[in-house]
Amino acid sequence: MNLNNIYVKTVGIVSLSCGILGEDSVQHEVKIGIERLKKFGLNVKFMEHSRKGLSYISEHPEKRAEDLINAFKDDSIDMILCAIGGDDTYKLLPYLFDNDELKRVVKQKNFLGFSDTTMNHLMLHKLGIKTFYGQSFLADLCELDKCMLPYTEKYFVELIRTGKIKKNRAKRCMV
C-alpha cells in the first residue's frame, strides 16, 4: 500500500528504554515491521544505537538520549517511533536536560510510543511538543500475523497521512 499525500515520509526508530530491538531473537519481527512501514510508503531510519542490544542499551542511557536528540536534529525524520517500552527511560533525563541540549534542538515532530515511553511524552509535553500515546514498533507494527490489527493499522495510517488522529470515541459496552 503506497499512500498518496502522506504527511510522514521518514520514520526514525529509537530505543529509549529496552534494547531488545538489537537481539537476534526478534530480527524476524524487525524485518516484518520494516516491510510494513515500506508498504505504507515510508522510509525507515534506525537511530545509531537503537539496535545495539539489551546490555548496551541498558548500560548507556547517554547513547539513548543522544539518539533522541539526533532524531529531532535530523530534518529528514518526520516521525519518531519508539521501538518498545521498558522500565528505565528515566535514566535519560540528566542527559537530556542537564545541558539543555534537547530544549535547544526540539521541534514539532510526531512522537509515538507507549508504556515506559510515558516519561518521554511528559518531558516533550513540558517542552511544548504534541505527542501521540500509541503504537510502538515491535509491539504493534511488527505484529506476527499476515497483517496488523485493523484498529492499530487504521489509526497509524491516519497519523502518517495527516499528522494527527481524530478523537476516538469508544462505544459504550452494554452489559
Task: Give residue spans per PLM region.
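Short glycine-/acidic-enriched loop or helix-start segments at secondary-structure transitions
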Residues: 23, 89-92, 122-123, 143
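Gly/Ser/Thr-rich loops at beta-strand to alpha-helix junctions
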Residues: 17-21, 84-89, 112-119
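Flexible, glycine/proline-enriched loop segments at strand-loop-helix junctions
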Residues: 19-23, 107-111, 137-147
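Conserved anion/nucleotide-ligand pocket segment
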Residues: 130-175
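ATP/NTP phosphate-donor binding region
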Residues: 1-76
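Short, acidic/small-residue loops that bind anionic groups at enzyme active sites
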Residues: 98-123, 130-137
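Long, hydrophobic/aromatic-enriched structural stretches that serve as scaffold segments
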Residues: 71-97
